[in-house]
């Protein structure tokens, strides 16, 4: 945290916060004091957590005293607001913590009595006294209003307690909320209640220091300005403090500008940089702002120069080669696309061309072939052979038509036409697919171009997916609607992360706005919403996955199809990095998210469950052996239903050597809530996660239990015809959750990536092994046993298999090139 100099630094000596560290995951015991250290830990992913640290054996409803970062495997980090549980094996290093020790007491008439328990129904706003009303359904099923008041302030958290009820029936409802979640006027009023003498500069500066430690620098400057107005005689004493505040505020803004630029919001970042007055900032900070602006200008100039040079070279070649109409047509199309679409996100496609542009040993045709092939296939897949590359636009157009999608008969024709072109082999098609714009993109205009915008961000985009209904109801198609918001300055040439979110009892619109935020027309830029997902540059889709009247998650094929179909539709419509797809949900939307992601871990970079339980099938699949799934769970301390249902999976993942990487965040004293204050932390975590995928030269081991016919594929192994005696459908789920006659599918591949051990050897209708160059060497024979009777042969990549795989799975980043069908 920053600290003030001058008068402010001499007076801000506030009480050391008394931390408590404990499990507090049940109603059976209170928080437990511990001898834990206040430290910062850095996870292997790069995520940093701070707080008092201790270790425990397991998350449990039984009493356990944490060790002070001892030998136990589950590490607990208490920062006063939350307790975060991580696995010791996932920690890279630890260091000193910078958490603030400031704690201010606010007097309120608090209630005593036993701890209150119930289900949260509604939350009212805070008034000017720091009071709010929550409504809970108590153990007698009554709707009970409870008035709470703010009693403690810390730069990271505030504590609220139940106030005295004059009608009796007092209960202790103590909760911790994020300080950042308080409305600014409420926080200011509470801080000013700690001031006994408004003319006392020492007391007034304590408020400024609080804002600084809370990293609310604009509020700190506003508070200091008010102090200077109220105490003009002491104004000169604050000069050094004001300068330091301006520096901290400016550095904070610059960090935000750079972050926005890094997630693809260049226009917004430039507007922010141009709007701030740097005149009274120190020289280095001024230089940093100037450097950012100059880099932006230099990038634009580099793009304009690249356009001018390449277009000029193309035009000269066209004029001099009337005998090459195919090359002329290709270059004319290149001129149009480069002139219209060249930008920072695709400039690297021309890097091979730019690197050799002054090489006198290259002919004009070779150089233009480098530019053309780089533009369509990427700079790492270029060719100097213009006779081959001249057909690339034709090949790309056929691929786009195939995925449009074309009718079945036309797809057969396209495959035949592709055979004519040298650069239509699977290796070339894979490169084209990766660099292809979304094949079913909606008509948005180009958010990157002023005056060409049909989506402004004010209203969501609306779509629907259709899935086949259950046979019991005649297989009638069922439609599911979903809403989409795009991040500011969405650019189809950039690959974005996707957040697919599932509602609970709220509306699909409300679920979308939780992540995307509200529209801000005052910013004057296209597509600006103020939600955390927009800030981080995520595309957000909110799926109305439930049928009318549905009040619980049913673990059905219909629900899985709806969610996975929505994800694939998004991959077809928008420019999405398929290694950065996250499934999240609230309440029983979280229950759905856990089930779908844990059953299909190869589809997602991570799953985020908020105030929901890990239920039936995931509790059977928790020890499936595979490449791993990243799991982020958020619960309230008093949400015992979610905790008791999920603890088995959490403990196995945190404590054992299993394959899912898990983090559990528990909000102190809280019930079943939306936990919006956690969204920024969730997205910080998402930023660091990627989908796990087999890699060449690394051993792969998959061994997964199957209970439902639609849980039949993991990465590259797909099982067909799950025997009836091995199925446990949702309607037949045993009451005790036991007695399963499940079957496992497995595929093990050593480092040489030429042999696959595939099981079961006989049961079921067959197994398909899907192959890709990331983990298979197609120049060597592939052996498979015991399934398939000892298959050993070369496997040839196929255009049809590749394009059909992309048409069905919509994953243009990691398509399969070939397959082996085993009876």
Protein language model annotation of sequence segments:
Residues 579-625:
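Primarily recognizes the serine-hydrolase "nucleophile elbow" in alpha/beta-hydrolase
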Residues 35-333, 337:
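Compositionally biased alpha-helical segments
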Residues 553-574:
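Alpha/beta-hydrolase active-site loop
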Residues 494-505:
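Short beta-strand element of the alpha/beta-hydrolase
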Residues 304-496, 805-807, 811:
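A domain-start/cap signature at the N-terminus of enzymes
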Residues 708-751, 755-823:
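C-terminal beta-sandwich/jelly-roll accessory domains of carbohydrate-active enzymes
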Residues 640, 644-754, 762:
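C-terminal catalytic histidine-bearing segment of alpha/beta-hydrolase fold enzymes
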Residues 633-635:
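Short beta-strand/loop motif that positions the catalytic acidic residue
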């Amino acid at each position: 945290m920053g600290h003030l100099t001058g008068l402010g630094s001499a007076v801000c000596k506030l009480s050391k916060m008394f931390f408590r560290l404990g499990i507090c995951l049940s109603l059976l015991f209170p928080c437990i004091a511990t001898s834990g250290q206040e430290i910062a830990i850095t996870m292997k992913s790069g995520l940093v957590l701070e707080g008092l640290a201790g270790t425990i054996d397991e998350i449990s409803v039984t009493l356990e005293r944490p060790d002070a970062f001892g030998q136990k495997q589950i590490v607990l980090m208490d920062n006063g607001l939350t307790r975060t549980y991580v696995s010791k094996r996932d920690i890279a290093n630890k260091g000193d913590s910078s958490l603030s020790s400031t704690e201010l007491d606010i007097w309120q008439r608090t209630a005593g009595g036993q701890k209150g328990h119930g289900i949260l129904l509604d939350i009212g706003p805070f008034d000017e006294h720091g009071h709010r009303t929550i409504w809970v359904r108590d153990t007698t099923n009554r709707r009970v209003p409870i008035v709470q008041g703010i009693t403690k302030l810390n730069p990271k958290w505030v504590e609220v307690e139940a106030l005295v009820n004059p009608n009796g029936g007092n209960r202790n409802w103590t909760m911790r909320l994020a300080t950042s979640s308080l409305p600014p006027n409420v926080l200011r009023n509470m801080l000013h209640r700690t001031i006994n003498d408004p003319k006392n500069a020492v007391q007034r500066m304590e408020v400024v220091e609080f804002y600084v430690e809370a990293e609310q620098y604009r509020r700190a400057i506003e508070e200091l300005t008010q102090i200077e107005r109220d105490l003009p005689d002491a104004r000169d004493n604050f000069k050094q403090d004001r300068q330091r505040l301006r520096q901290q505020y400016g550095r904070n803004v610059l960090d935000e500008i750079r972050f926005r630029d890094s997630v693809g919001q260049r226009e917004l970042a430039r507007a922010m940089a141009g709007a701030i007055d740097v005149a009274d900032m120190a020289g280095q900070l001024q230089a940093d702002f100037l450097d950012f602006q100059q880099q932006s200008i230099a990038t634009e100039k580099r793009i304009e120069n690249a356009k001018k040079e390449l277009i000029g070279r193309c035009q000269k070649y066209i004029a001099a080669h009337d005998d090459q109409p195919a090359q002329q047509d290709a270059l004319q199309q290149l001129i149009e696309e480069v002139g219209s679409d060249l930008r920072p996100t695709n400039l690297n496609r021309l890097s091979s061309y730019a690197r050799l542009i002054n090489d006198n040993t290259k002919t004009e045709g070779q150089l233009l072939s480098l530019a053309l092939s780089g533009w369509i296939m990427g700079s790492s897949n270029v060719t100097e052979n213009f006779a081959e590359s001249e057909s690339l636009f034709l090949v790309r157009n056929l691929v786009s038509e195939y995925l449009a999608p074309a009718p079945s008969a036309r797809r057969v024709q396209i495959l035949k036409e592709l055979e004519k072109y040298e650069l239509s082999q699977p290796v070339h098609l894979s490169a084209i697919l990766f660099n292809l714009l979304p094949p079913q993109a909606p008509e948005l205009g180009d958010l990157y171009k002023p005056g060409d915008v049909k989506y402004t961000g004010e209203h969501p985009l609306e779509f629907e997916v259709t899935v086949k209904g259950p046979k019991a109801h005649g297989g009638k198609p069922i439609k599911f609607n979903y809403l989409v918001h795009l991040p500011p300055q969405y650019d189809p040439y950039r690959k974005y992360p996707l957040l697919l979110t599932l509602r609970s009892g709220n509306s699909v619109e409300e679920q979308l706005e939780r992540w995307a935020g509200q529209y801000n027309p005052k910013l004057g830029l296209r597509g600006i919403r103020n939600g955390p997902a927009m800030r981080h540059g995520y595309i957000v889709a909110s799926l109305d996955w439930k049928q009318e009247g549905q009040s619980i998650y049913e673990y059905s094929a219909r629900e899985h199809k709806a969610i996975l179909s929505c994800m694939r539709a998004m991959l077809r419509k928008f420019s999405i990095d398929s290694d950065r797809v996250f499934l999240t949900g609230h309440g029983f939307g979280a229950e759905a998210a856990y089930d779908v992601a844990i059953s299909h871990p190869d589809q997602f970079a991570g799953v985020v469950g908020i105030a929901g339980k890990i239920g039936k099938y995931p509790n059977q699949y928790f020890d499936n052996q595979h490449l791993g799934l990243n799991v982020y769970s958020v619960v309230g301390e008093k949400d015992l239903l979610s905790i008791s249902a999920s603890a088995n999976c959490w403990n196995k993942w945190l404590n054992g050597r299993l394959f899912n990487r898990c983090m559990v965040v528990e909000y102190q004293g809280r019930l079943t809530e939306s936990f919006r204050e956690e969204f920024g932390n969730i997205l910080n975590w998402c930023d660091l996660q990627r989908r796990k995928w087999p890699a060449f030269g690394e051993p792969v081991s998959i061994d997964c239990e199957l209970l439902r016919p639609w849980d039949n594929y993991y990465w590259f192994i797909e099982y067909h015809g799950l025997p009836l005696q091995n199925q446990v459908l949702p309607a037949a789920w045993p009451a005790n959750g036991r007695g399963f006659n499940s079957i496992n599918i497995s595929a093990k591949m050593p480092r040489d990536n030429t042999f696959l051990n595939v099981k079961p050897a006989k049961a079921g209708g067959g197994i398909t092994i899907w192959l890709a160059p990331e983990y298979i060497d197609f120049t060597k024979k592939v052996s498979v046993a015991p399934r398939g009777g000892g298959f050993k042969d070369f496997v040839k990549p196929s255009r049809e298999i590749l394009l059909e795989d992309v048409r069905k799975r919509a994953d243009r980043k990691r398509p399969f090139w070939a397959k082996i069908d085993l009876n």
